[in-house]
Amino acid sequence: MIMSVMASDSARAVVCTSRPFPKQKLRELVLQALYALEMAPKGEDSLVSLLMTEASVSKKNVLYALMFCKAIRANQSELDALLNATIRTTTLANLTIIERNILRMMLFEHQQNQESSPIPTAVLIAETTRLIKKFSYVEGSSLILAVLGSIFDQVAQEPASMCG
C-alpha cells in the first residue's frame, strides 16, 4: 500500500507499508505525538521509543505516525486560522491541548482526503467522538463537533470548479 501526505504545498512524503496500519491506531499515535511535541517541542528523538513502549507498536508504525504529525504541524498556521475563524464562543488557545490537536488532526485529514479518496464526514465525526471519549472529556465534545461540523458543511456546500 502506498500513501502520500502533504507536508506543505511544495513537499509530498510518500510512505510504503507492507500491511495497512489500522487508521484508528494511527490517529491515536498521531494525537499522542502532537500532544507530546506541544508539551516538549524538542523531544522528538525520545518520542519514538516512548510511543513504541506506551502504544506497543513497531518503530516503523511510530515513524509513520510522526510523518503525519509533521505534516499537520507544517500546516498548523493554516489549520488554526480556519479553526479560529469558525469558533464562535471562545478561541483555539482556550481549548485544551488535546482538543486543539483533535481539531487540527481531523481537519487536516478531511482536507487531505478531499484531494484523493474522501472519507465520509460521518466517519470523521464518529472518529472525533471516539478520540474525545478516549483522550479528553465528553463535555468538550459539543464544541469540537460543532466546529468540525460547520467546516465540513462549508466544504460540502462549495460548488465544484468548472472546466471551461
From Swiss-Prot:
Keywords: RNA-binding, Transcription, Transcription antitermination, Transcription regulation. The keyword Transport does not apply. One of its GO terms (biological process) is transcription antitermination. One of its GO terms (cellular component) is cytosol. The keyword Transcription applies. Gene3D superfamilies: NusB-like. GO terms for molecular function: RNA binding. This is Transcription antitermination protein NusB. Involved in transcription antitermination. Required for transcription of ribosomal RNA (rRNA) genes. Binds specifically to the boxA antiterminator sequence of the ribosomal RNA (rrn) operons. Signal peptide: none annotated. Pfam families: NusB. Belongs to the NusB family. PANTHER family: ANTITERMINATION NUSB DOMAIN-CONTAINING PROTEIN, N UTILIZATION SUBSTANCE PROTEIN B-RELATED.
